[in-house]
Amino acid sequence: MALTQQRKQEIINNYQVHGTDTGSTDVQIAMLTERINRLSEHLQANKKDHSSRRGLLKLIGHRKRLLAYLQQESREKYQALIGRLGIRG
């Protein structure tokens, strides 16, 4: 379920703002989205895994707060990011 180092690096390369960026809001949201997608697949196969479901809800809440921050800071970056990630309609 955990992301491999190679997959993390791919996400960072795709969403980084500048060459050494590893912790910007865009990268954090992209990482959380990948983890949420993997955990959702796991929960579809393992419906009774309630501890993982709780973890999923925590990740969704964290991503929601980061998205709210990004929307407040830069509406254009927010719209572009949710379009690239395919979240929120």
From Swiss-Prot:
GO terms for biological process: translation. The keyword Ribonucleoprotein applies. InterPro entries: Ribosomal_uS15, Ribosomal_uS15_bac-type, uS15_NS1_RNA-bd_sf. Keywords: Ribonucleoprotein, Ribosomal protein, RNA-binding, rRNA-binding. The keyword Ribosomal protein applies. One of its GO terms (cellular component) is cytosolic small ribosomal subunit. It comes from the Bacteria. One of its GO terms (molecular function) is rRNA binding. It holds the Pfam family Ribosomal_S15. Belongs to the universal ribosomal protein uS15 family. HAMAP family: Ribosomal_uS15_B. Part of the 30S ribosomal subunit. Forms a bridge to the 50S subunit in the 70S ribosome, contacting the 23S rRNA. One of the primary rRNA binding proteins, it binds directly to 16S rRNA where it helps nucleate assembly of the platform of the 30S subunit by binding and bridging several RNA helices of the 16S rRNA. This is Small ribosomal subunit protein uS15. The lineage of its organism: Bacteria, Bacillati, Cyanobacteriota, Cyanophyceae, Nostocales.
